[in-house]
């Protein structure tokens, strides 16, 4: 495997971001790392989140010789990026909720952010709103249950629409015309979300913007992705997880996504160098 793009998330949500990156860079190699032993991240204390993510990602970068890291998790991106960039010597890309494009797109100037409780309460999120959506009424909806519903859907192919409708009731009542999906798990539920909310609500996520950023960094940095080394059929795909075991359904989903290797990784001590 050549220097891969390493995509990281707490669970399978980052696959939505990985899919967008692969559209732009289909011949590159990829490592997908999901810390499902600590899922969902939205309920972790900030210091625990930072130390665990930095330790795990650093370990995988050293092992795989990744050329860039994509933190495909909104909750982690709000707090982990400074420490991770200080630790690593390769580009690190995070996820920014699509507040700015939502504010520009909204005709009613009533927009919403659907994210984990951790993302909703972070100062970073409120700064984004103040900076880019000051002319809008912004409703914030924090929900970790949707993360687990997305995980369940990927693992089993099933999703409880009745429960989803209950969860989204406040969103429906808010009378929005644009809803930002502020968790990378939520695009996995896009069809069901649209079904409940109706076509009058536009759903926005950050996947395409992240892919563009990765492409730009690789093309203009030392790790050039656009060369003959990558002009081959397909790419090598490896996945790593932290939980003791994963379901057969999830393993099948990952295989269907193109992952040829699936391996559990034991995290090192967060204080180790």
From Swiss-Prot:
Pathway: Cell wall biogenesis; peptidoglycan biosynthesis. GO terms for biological process: cell wall organization; peptidoglycan biosynthetic process; regulation of cell shape. Pfam families: Asp_Glu_race (PF01177). The active site is at 73 (proton donor/acceptor), 183 (proton donor/acceptor). Gene3D superfamilies: 3.40.50.1860. PROSITE patterns: ASP_GLU_RACEMASE_1, ASP_GLU_RACEMASE_2. The keyword Cell wall biogenesis/degradation applies. Substrate binds at residues 9-10, 41-42, 74-75, 184-185. Keywords: Cell shape, Cell wall biogenesis/degradation, Isomerase, Peptidoglycan synthesis. It catalyses: L-glutamate = D-glutamate. Belongs to the aspartate/glutamate racemases family. Provides the (R)-glutamate required for cell wall biosynthesis. NCBIfam families: glut_race. This is Glutamate racemase. It comes from Shewanella oneidensis (strain ATCC 700550 / JCM 31522 / CIP 106686 / LMG 19005 / NCIMB 14063 / MR-1). The gene is murI.
């Amino acid at each position: 495997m050549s220097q891969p793009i390493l995509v990281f998330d707490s669970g399978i949500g980052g696959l939505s971001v990985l899919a967008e990156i692969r559209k732009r860079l289909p011949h590159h190699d990829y490592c997908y790392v999901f810390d499902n032993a600590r899922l969902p991240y939205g309920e972790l204390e900030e210091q625990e989140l930072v130390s665990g993510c930095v330790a795990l990602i650093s370990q995988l970068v050293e092992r795989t010789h990744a050329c860039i890291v994509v933190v495909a998790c909104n909750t982690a991106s709000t707090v982990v990026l400074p420490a991770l960039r200080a630790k690593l010597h390769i580009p690190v890309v995070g996820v920014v909720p699509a507040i700015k494009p939502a504010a520009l797109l909204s005709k009613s100037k009533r927009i919403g952010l659907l994210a984990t409780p951790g993302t909703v309460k972070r100062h970073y999120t409120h700064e984004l709103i103040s900076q880019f959506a000051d002319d809008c009424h912004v409703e914030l909806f924090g929900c970790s249950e949707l993360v687990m519903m997305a995980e369940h859907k990927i693992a089993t192919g099933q999703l409880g629409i009745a429960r989803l409708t209950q969860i989204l009731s406040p969103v429906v009542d808010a009378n929005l015309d644009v809803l930002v999906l502020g968790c990378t798990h939520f695009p996995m539920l896009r069809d069901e979300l649209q079904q409940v909310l109706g076509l009058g609500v536009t759903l926005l996520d950050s996947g395409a913007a992240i892919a563009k950023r990765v492409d730009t960094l690789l093309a203009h940095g030392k790790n050039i992705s656009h060369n003959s080394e990558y002009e081959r059929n397909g790419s090598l795909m490896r996945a790593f997880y932290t939980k003791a075991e994963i379901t057969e359904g999830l393993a099948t989903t990952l295989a269907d996504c193109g992952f040829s290797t699936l391996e559990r990784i034991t995290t090192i001590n967060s204080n180790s160098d």
